[in-house]
UniProtKB/Swiss-Prot annotation:
PANTHER family referenced in this protein's UniProt entry, alphabetically: PSEUDOURIDYLATE SYNTHASE TRUB1, TRNA-PSEUDOURIDINE SYNTHASE
Xref: CDD domains: PseudoU_synth_EcTruB
Swiss-Prot/TrEMBL catalytic activity: uridine(55) in tRNA = pseudouridine(55) in tRNA
Keywords, in A-Z order: Isomerase, tRNA processing
Keyword Nuclease applies: no
Membership in a protein family: Belongs to the pseudouridine synthase TruB family. Type 1 subfamily.
GO MF annotations in UniProt: RNA binding; tRNA pseudouridine(55) synthase activity
Transmembrane regions listed in the UniProt entry: none
Classification via InterPro entries: PsdUridine_synth_cat_dom_sf (IPR020103), PsdUridine_synth_N (IPR002501), tRNA_psdUridine_synth_TruB (IPR014780), TruB_C (IPR032819)
Single GO biological process annotation from the record: mRNA pseudouridine synthesis
Organism: Parasynechococcus marenigrum (strain WH8102)
Protein name, per record: tRNA pseudouridine synthase B
Entry EC number(s): 5.4.99.25
Length: 291
C-alpha cells in the first residue's frame, strides 16, 4: 500500500473545528484523501478518528455508537442548547437528590425520539439547520429515533445546578438535546455546559493523540483492523488474493451480518466484502498494493 493507510485518533482541542483538524493532517501527511468520522462542535473536546488515504473508504463500516462525558447546567435555556448560544431564559433549579435525578433520567434510556437542536447539521429543505438559525429563522425540527444505550449519573452539584453524565449512544444523538429535554422535564430548563467525547467509531480516548503542529512529524497511523473488530472476518489464501483483487466472488461460511472484513494471507487488510444470499462474498472495497 503506497502512502499512509489507516487511522489517526486526535484528541480534538476546544476551539478547533473537525474540518480544521482534517486540514492540519492533510498538510502533515501530504495527503488529499483525509476524512473524519463524526463532527465535533468547536467547543467539544475528545476523540476524533481521522482516516488517511484509502482508509477513508472504510468510514461507513465503522461502528456508529459514541460515548460522551458531559456537564449539564440546569436553569439556563439558550438558543443553541449549550452555553455557546444566546441566553433566552433563566430559572431556579429544584432542590434535587441523586435518587430524584435517576428517576428523571430513566425515560431517556433506550430507544427514544429526540428533537435535534436548531443549531445543528440536520438538513431542512436542502440546507443545514444551523445556517437557517444564524439568519434568525425559528424552526421546529421533527424528532428522530435514537438510542441511548447507557446513561450514568457521575456527579450532582446542587449548589451550581450542574450534573455530570456519561452517555453511550447511537449515531445521530445530540447531547445538547438531552440537556434541553432533561431540563424541560425538571421544569427549570437546561443546556449543555461542557462535553468531551471519550469513544467514537471503535476508537478509545486512550488511543487519542494531541493535534500535531502543521510542520511536525505526524504519528504513524493505526491499523484499520482495530476499528473493525465488530465485523466477521474472512482470510484469503495465497491463491485467492488475485481473485479478490479482480473482483471475483469468493466462498463464505454461513454467518451473521452483511459486511465482512477480508484479510490477506499475511493478515493485512484486503478490503470489505458483502455477504450474498447464496453465501458468496462479493468484493465491495478492494485494497491492492497501490491503494
Amino acid at each position: 500500500m503506497d502512502g499512509p493507510f489507516g487511522f489517526v485518533v486526535i484528541d480534538k482541542p476546544a476551539g478547533h473545528t473537525s474540518h480544521s483538524c482534517v486540514s492540519r493532517l492533510r498538510r502533515c501527511y501530504g495527503l488529499k484523501r483525509v476524512g473524519h468520522g463524526g463532527t465535533l462542535d468547536p467547543a467539544v473536546t475528545g476523540v476524533l478518528p481521522i482516516a488517511l488515504g484509502p482508509a477513508t473508504r472504510l468510514l461507513p463500516y465503522l461502528p456508529g455508537d459514541k460515548t460522551y462525558r458531559g456537564v449539564i447546567q440546569l436553569g439556563s435555556i439558550t438558543s443553541s442548547d449549550d452555553l455557546e448560544g444566546e441566553l433566552l431564559r433563566q430559572a431556579p433549579w429544584p432542590d434535587l437528590q441523586p435518587e430524584e435525578l435517576e428517576v428523571a433520567l430513566a425515560p431517556f434510556r433506550g430507544p427514544i425520539q429526540q428533537r435535534p437542536p436548531q443549531v445543528s447539521a440536520v438538513h431542512v429543505d436542502g440546507e443545514r439547520a444551523h445556517a437557517r438559525a444564524r439568519r434568525g429563522e425559528q424552526m421546529v425540527l421533527p424528532p428522530r429515533p435514537v438510542t441511548i444505550h447507557r446513561l450514568q449519573l457521575l456527579h450532582w452539584d446542587p449548589n451550581q445546578g450542574q450534573l455530570t453524565l456519561e452517555v453511550h449512544c447511537s449515531a445521530g444523538t445530540y447531547i445538547r438535546s438531552l440537556a434541553r429535554d432533561l431540563g424541560e422535564q425538571l421544569g427549570c430548563g437546561g443546556c449543555l455546559a461542557q462535553l468531551r467525547r471519550t469513544q467514537a467509531l471503535g476508537f478509545l480516548e486512550s488511543q487519542a493523540q494531541a493535534l500535531p503542529e502543521a510542520d511536525a512529524t505526524p504519528p504513524p497511523p493505526l491499523s484499520p483492523l482495530l476499528a473493525l473488530e465488530h465485523l466477521p472476518r474472512r482470510q484469503l489464501t495465497d491463491s485467492e488474493e488475485a481473485d479478490w483483487r479482480c473482483g471475483r466472488r469468493l466462498s463464505l461460511d454461513p454467518g451473521p451480518g452483511d459486511a465482512v472484513v477480508v484479510c490477506n494471507a499475511d493478515g493485512s487488510m484486503a478490503g470489505i466484502g458483502l455477504r450474498q444470499e447464496d453465501d458468496q462474498l462479493q468484493p465491495k472495497v478492494v485494497f491492492d498494493a497501490s491503494g
